[in-house]
Amino acid sequence: NTEIKTVAVMGSMHEIGFFEGSIDENTSCRPESFYGIAKNALREVTAILAKQEKKTFMWLRGFYIVGNSQYGSSIFSKISAAAERGDKEFPFTMGLNQFDFLDYDVFCKYVSAAITQDKVNGIINICSGRPERLSDRVERFIKENDYNIKLKYGAFPDRPYDSKAIWGNDTKIKSIMEGVSTIIKK
């Protein structure tokens, strides 16, 4: 369709594969999970088609979204469901790995801001820009939601294929958000 000027797709940090450190738009992707492989293939095909059709391409790379819906598959959804059931303990790893967490409302603001502007495109990390220990974020989540549940540390082993510390470079999303605040001030 010639009326479509921009193609924006929700990506995932899982398309990167095992990596430790800060991820930016130039970080090589070597996914090892079927989900990561599928997301990476979608990103590559969409980028090629957008270029062929002369469309602006935005790949919105999501990281770890924190929300209290009990219907998702994230650790936060599982804890919410367990708390709703009245469970007093939640089996957990040691929680030492560090990830980039973003609260759902902030995630939504970032995605909305990214797709409604035309200055920054390509791969845009929808992220906080900093790593945080899983145990710290989960404990804070439990407290924020006033859940009466405790983590049972060490019930599960840490997964050997999980990165010890992985987070997004937030340069592009910061630039977008600065542009949004400039427009609002005018």
Predicted regions and their residues:
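Active-site helix of classical SDR
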Residues: 34, 38-41
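C-terminal substrate-binding subdomain of Rossmann-fold SDR/epimerase-dehydratase oxidoreductases
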Residues: 85-87, 91-95, 99-186
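NAD(P)-dependent short-chain dehydrogenase/reductase
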Residues: 44-98, 104-106, 141
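Hydrophobic/aromatic residues located in beta-strands of well-ordered beta-sheets
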Residues: 6-10, 57, 90, 151
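Hydrophobic positions on the long internal alpha-helix
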Residues: 1, 45-46, 110, 114
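A short helix-coil junction within the Rossmann-fold of NAD(P)-dependent oxidoreductases
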Residues: 1-5, 49, 118
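Conserved Rossmann-fold NAD(P)-dependent oxidoreductase catalytic core, especially the SDR/UDP-sugar
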Residues: 1-34
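Active-site proximal helix/loop that lines the substrate pocket
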Residues: 12-18, 64-70, 131
